[in-house]
Amino acid sequence: MALVRALVCCLLTAWHCRSGLGLPVAPAGGRNPPPAIGQFWHVTDLHLDPTYHITDDHTKVCASSKGANASNPGPFGDVLCDSPYQLILSAFDFIKNSGQEASFMIWTGDSPPHVPVPELSTDTVINVITNMTTTIQSLFPNLQVFPALGNHDYWPQDQLPVVTSKVYNAVANLWKPWLDEEAISTLRKGGFYSQKVTTNPNLRIISLNTNLYYGPNIMTLNKTDPANQFEWLESTLNNSQQNKEKVYIIAHVPVGYLPSSQNITAMREYYNEKLIDIFQKYSDVIAGQFYGHTHRDSIMVLSDKKGSPVNSLFVAPAVTPVKSVLEKQTNNPGIRLFQYDPRDYKLLDMLQYYLNLTEANLKGESIWKLEYILTQTYDIEDLQPESLYGLAKQFTILDSKQFIKYYNYFFVSYDSSVTCDKTCKAFQICAIMNLDNISYADCLKQLYIKHNY
């Protein structure tokens, strides 16, 4: 009940205390692109904590700290807490007032906070998702938004089912303004859908429920095709191929290997291999892939079975700055803007924006800034697989300045003094360039790891 009461309070008060929504904007040289360039926003991992409030007892600032002392709580949050509503609102206000024209937005899941299971309920989870949805709809009434469910967008967390549920039905009703009847139907049944972009009729968004493949999800243990999503995905991609459409894949839990760990996939390995096979088969149709979940900023390049790069994948950093007490690093809040060619939907560039949380709390105003422009920062031509693969090759150079920048951006410029030793670098680079188990293992063995594993 405490979370429900706090949820109501945060919504009633936040609209009246929106201090200092100062907007940077696009860099000099005028990054407001000509109409020949299409744009879309990507936001992820909002993780609203309705209980967040400033109090002298730092163990009670937020439920998401789980009793730990909040380190330096301010109006826009704390690194041991999930997002206060004021932080989330500042992100969307920045987007609204940035001056950037966008065709649509993708929103890749995880609205509720990281709190113990007994502190949430199905109704509370639905209430949080409802709040985030209505916030977006009120600020962007004419923008088509494509959501994907996250592992926390359910109760109990991670246990997203293979059949219809109260949550699936609720989000299907909430997201009707953005989706057609067929998309709503599959969303109700399994938490996934495909939908054409209204402003770009030859571009289709496929929103996958990759939480079905997530390790902690016991609802899908020993199932070869949970909710028949693989079968549906292949059929949808095949239809897009026949109809000469291009597809952007969006989901919460990404494919591939976690860049901060050794030999750990973000989802169960069997499902990862199956998805990789499908993505390789239809790489000519898929023009980009976009994920969340890790809270970090990373790229991946999918290669075909001959080793040629065929797909670009982007994992976006979270809006929430939360970390556990055991973690040394976290991320500043981040949101991003992609640019694409509206003729063929090839990805051209990405502008990453961030909020320096320490500075925002100190000044009492949220000044979102441009962190980097991907092509300019790394001196590459575009965001095509060949360009990203070439960049990853540059990362392998000893003391690569390119990689030093990449690793700082991995944490959204949270701590520029952070370093990545040889083993850390191996995990990062192999995760970028190798998404399947055989090539990933070969990468670690041949290039970096001296011992057998």
UniProtKB/Swiss-Prot annotation:
Tissue and organ distribution: Detected in blood serum. Detected in macrophages (at protein level).
Effect of N222Q: Impaired protein maturation and secretion
Annotated keywords: Disulfide bond, Glycoprotein, Hydrolase, Metal-binding, Secreted, Signal, Zinc
Compartment(s): Secreted
Triggers of expression: Up-regulated in macrophages in response to cholesterol accumulation. Up-regulated by cAMP. Expression is stimulated by LXL lipid metabolism.
Modulation of this protein's activity: Requires micromolar levels of Zn(2+) for activity. Inhibited by millimolar levels of Zn(2+).
Cofactor requirements of the protein: Zn(2+)
Protein name as annotated: Cyclic GMP-AMP phosphodiesterase SMPDL3A
Source organism of this protein record: Homo sapiens (Human)
Source organism phylogeny: Eukaryota, Metazoa, Chordata, Craniata, Vertebrata
